[in-house]
């Protein structure tokens, strides 16, 4: 009998902070299951979830505005510990009778917080000792408003020179508020604070580990699928690969994977996928060579959004054709992960904004009458990777840089042609190979090559050449929300450029993209 890995659970209410998912990831890293919900949940939903503790996230709004979000009243009557972070602390203070004011001086960035009273939250946690002998913490602040009066029965447990109540506590009710962000790495002891809250204050046991997640997923897949057959679109990416391994472990040959080679993959990628999953791991795989079909659908299309939609549409058509041949398949497996679930379940106050359409969300035919199997829908990407390692997938494959769903379709600018894809594949392979050779691959967050549909004059020997241009792109980022261009050594870039131009007939010039995000996006399209 597998352990109940959901036995202990934390509920995180999202007030719109860019860091909210980080809170959830930190709690999961502690080994405890948690879910992230919009702030406007009902008492009934909270009761049904039955959390051992609740965390109120930060957010961009001001508590001083009458229509700003508030925690459901039941949060403070549920009898469980509550931790308010930044905006979460402010709304806790205001809702429980304290006073919050807008400040003309924002606190943003590193700050030193002095602990003025002992508390369960900060027990044995310090970065330094002040002259008067009190513990001090190095933290990350990001707020304009501040708590000016704490509620009755609360005590101030930390201060900064500009923030009279940097943290507060009601030890009897186990309510805590911190004005800083313990979830970000800049708050040096942040992970320990969250661990104290989750384990010592909420009394949660660490049951959420890669091994127990696999055990639980396998049991659930077996229960759901029974003796039926399952079909999965295997791309060779992290999510679909881990889904394939999980379902294969659960039901073996009842799983059939369909690998669609759309002509938009990296160099030798199709061959690598077939060798790894078919030959090495022994999965049932059908390989569909659909390059011509995809390139034909992309003919004459230059707009990036239209290209994405065309690629998505053709994938669905090809997959649908193959699934109809598998008469006994009753279940469709998908690599949906928790951030996809969070995105689609946006708060009913709805403030989401689409920047780029995602090729893998929705879009399956209405007449595909199959049940869905989504074994990763509770997991963040970093958890998916750790589960993959536990399942025996190679590290280099799981921690490879992100590759867009539409593949080279959005790395060839403008119209996609076979000639362009072939040139780009080879140029990109050289760039990635050299990053590995120079031990730079894992020092950048993402690196790739872009094909520019413009010709440039070059010189080769005594002759003049008039060939295509490619751009190298490498960025450093923590969360892919913002990114800096990677300052790769000039001699390295020169070496890569020489190799590409000398080894690939058809490319005459290599440029390096030095745009950050913002204002640019990481991918060009």
Swiss-Prot record:
The lineage of its organism: Bacteria, Pseudomonadati, Pseudomonadota, Gammaproteobacteria, Aeromonadales. PROSITE patterns: GATASE_TYPE_1 (PS51273), GMPS_ATP_PPASE (PS51553). This is GMP synthase [glutamine-hydrolyzing]. InterPro entries: Class_I_gatase-like, GATASE, GMP_synth_C, GMP_synth_GATase, GMP_synthase, GMPS_ATP_PPase_dom, NAD/GMP_synthase, Rossmann-like_a/b/a_fold. It comes from Tolumonas auensis (strain DSM 9187 / NBRC 110442 / TA 4). NCBIfam families: guaA_Cterm, guaA_Nterm, PRK00074.1. Residues 208-400 form the GMPS ATP-PPase domain. It is an enzyme of class 6 (ligase). The active site is at residues 86, 181, 183. ATP binds at residues 235-241. Residues 9-207 form the Glutamine amidotransferase type-1 domain. CDD domains: GATase1_GMP_Synthase (cd01742), GMP_synthase_C (cd01997). Catalyzes the synthesis of GMP from XMP. Its EC number is 6.3.5.2. Keywords: ATP-binding, Glutamine amidotransferase, GMP biosynthesis, Ligase, Nucleotide-binding, Purine biosynthesis. Pathway: Purine metabolism; GMP biosynthesis; GMP from XMP (L-Gln route): step 1/1. GO terms for cellular component: cytosol. PANTHER family: GMP SYNTHASE [GLUTAMINE-HYDROLYZING], GMP SYNTHASE-RELATED. It catalyses: XMP + L-glutamine + ATP + H2O = GMP + L-glutamate + AMP + diphosphate + 2 H(+). GO terms for molecular function: ATP binding; GMP synthase activity.
